[in-house]
Amino acid sequence: MASLKELRGRITGVKSTRKITNAMKMVAASKLRRAQMQAEAARPYADAMRRMMAELAMATRGEDAASLPRLLAGTGKDQTHLVVVLTSDRGLAGGFNANIVRSARQLVDTLVSEGKTVRILPVGRKGADILVRHYPEMITDRLAGSDGKDVGFDKATDIGSRIATMLDAGEIDRCTLVYNRFLNAMTQIPVQAPLVPLSVPENDNAAPDADTAQYEFEPDEATLLTQLLPRNLQVQIFSAMLESAAGEQGARMTAMDNASRNASKAIDRLSQKYNRTRQANITNDLIEIISGAEAV
């Protein structure tokens, strides 16, 4: 049985831990509000950009893939896939990083089983550390995440430039972005979003979207595609990074709230054990005193 001194030390230690987890929960909650506002503000722009690019791309159907921009049609082959994985630089966020890495590994394993060549570009230290252990020969580079700071568009520009450079050099044929889409503080959904080639609706007879139907393109669609495809790639990556940042803070706030609750329960259990031990010691002392008095 643990002594009273040991139990007091354990209670003090758990209380100190609870102070830390409570503080981290409050910090994550304050960051979550800002990150959520940024992610929600970026969604309409990214969605509108995606619809407009799909409208432009539909005008190029039937053309030879070799004559189209590679960011639109890829290289015309389906052999080498680049998988960009967005995770965080910091831990203590529950299953946030584990879930996205699991989704990325499922995608990579599926592609490998189909005989594809896979290259991985991890963004964020936590995901990179895991992926390097499982696929050391597939890692092309390791990029730092936002490290808890506001996500900058320059990071999305850098990632987009790397993808475009690899595509132009013929090093990859397709690219998929794996990230956590933010729903709320408790829910983040792993998403596998194709970046290259550009996703275009398959149904030629589908009614045009109310927004995209109003577009009139000047100059011609091909010229606009060449100019806008790099920007669209950057916008989609930036939007995903904002979603990931909001999801990270939501997951961390939830994890620290659960940790604080568990710490409180542990303190209650230890306090009960401490009181029972103290009462038992007092009872034993009384028995010894009474027994001694009777002996006299």
UniProtKB/Swiss-Prot annotation:
GO molecular function, one term: ATP binding
Topology in the lipid bilayer: Peripheral membrane protein
Xref: Pfam families: ATP-synt (PF00231)
Ion transport keyword on record: yes
Predominant location category: membrane
Gene3D superfamilies, alphabetized: 3.40.1380.10, ATP synthase, gamma subunit, helix hairpin domain (1.10.287.80)
Statement: the UniProt record of this protein carries the keyword Transport: yes
Listed GO biological process terms: proton motive force-driven plasma membrane ATP synthesis
Family: Belongs to the ATPase gamma chain family.
PANTHER family, A to Z: ATP SYNTHASE GAMMA CHAIN, ATP SYNTHASE SUBUNIT GAMMA, MITOCHONDRIAL
HAMAP family listed in its UniProt record: ATP_synth_gamma_bact (MF_00815)
Subunit structure: F-type ATPases have 2 components, CF(1) - the catalytic core - and CF(0) - the membrane proton channel. CF(1) has five subunits: alpha(3), beta(3), gamma(1), delta(1), epsilon(1). CF(0) has three main subunits: a, b and c.
Protein name: ATP synthase gamma chain
Organism per entry: Gluconobacter oxydans (strain 621H) (Gluconobacter suboxydans)
Name of the coding gene: atpG
